[in-house]
């Protein structure tokens, strides 16, 4: 099994679900250093001996693996492609798996991650969104790290059409 962007307060729930489904946690990925919650990555590593992973720009020393842009991560018969998508933070990565993308906070449902703290940069965010994520096929499912409105999945096409933060004509 793989968990992306785990929250510390939910590690017991993750472990319970893994046990109920008789799964072994192989890897845990954080898409970026989070300011809004404490990552469950170290706790899951300690409790399951899984491999921990972040992008190469992450200033974290708790991970066993750092990936580069366009690098493929293999988990059993599943491949994820790392996509460097800075802007929300300078260490933000998204992960593409077939017809779905896990965007961390780079692209939220009908929103985008803030760029006013944690080495965020609005121009980098614009480039990550318009030159990377929104170039994916419109039917690609979007799974952000969290959503403040209770939604947990969208598509690139829906975001292009309905996301108010994407209704801009330039990076200005």
Predicted regions mapped to residue ranges:
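Conserved beta-strand hairpin/beta-sheet module of binuclear metal-dependent hydrolase folds
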Residues: 1-24, 94-104, 110
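Hydrophobic residues in well-ordered beta-strands that form the structural core
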Residues: 4, 52-54, 103, 144
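Divalent metal-coordination and catalytic microenvironments
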Residues: 5, 32, 44, 67, ...
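Short, conserved glycine- and acidic-residue-centered signature motifs
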Residues: 7, 37, 118, 122
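Active-site HxH/HxHxD metal-binding segment of metal-dependent hydrolases
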Residues: 8-84, 161, 165
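Metallo-beta-lactamase
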Residues: 79, 89-170
């Amino acid at each position: 099994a793989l968990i992306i962007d785990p929250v510390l307060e939910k590690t017991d729930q993750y472990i319970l679900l893994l046990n109920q489904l008789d799964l072994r946690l192989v890897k845990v990925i954080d898409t970026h250093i989070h300011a809004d919650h404490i990552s469950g990555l170290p706790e899951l590593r300690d409790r399951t001996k899984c491999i921990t992973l972040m992008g190469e720009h992450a200033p974290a020393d708790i991970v066993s693996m750092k990936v580069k842009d366009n690098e493929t991560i293999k988990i059993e018969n599943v491949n994820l492609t790392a996509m460097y998508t800075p802007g929300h933070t300078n260490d933000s990565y998204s992960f593409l798996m077939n017809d779905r993308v896990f965007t961390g906070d780079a692209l939220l449902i009908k929103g985008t991650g803030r760029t006013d703290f944690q080495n965020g940069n609005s121009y980098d965010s614009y480039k990550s969104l318009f030159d990377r994520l929104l170039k994916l096929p419109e039917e690609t499912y979007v799974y952000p790290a969290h959503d403040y409105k209770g939604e947990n999945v969208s598509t690139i096409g829906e975001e292009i059409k309905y996301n108010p933060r994407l209704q801009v004509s330039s990076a200005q």
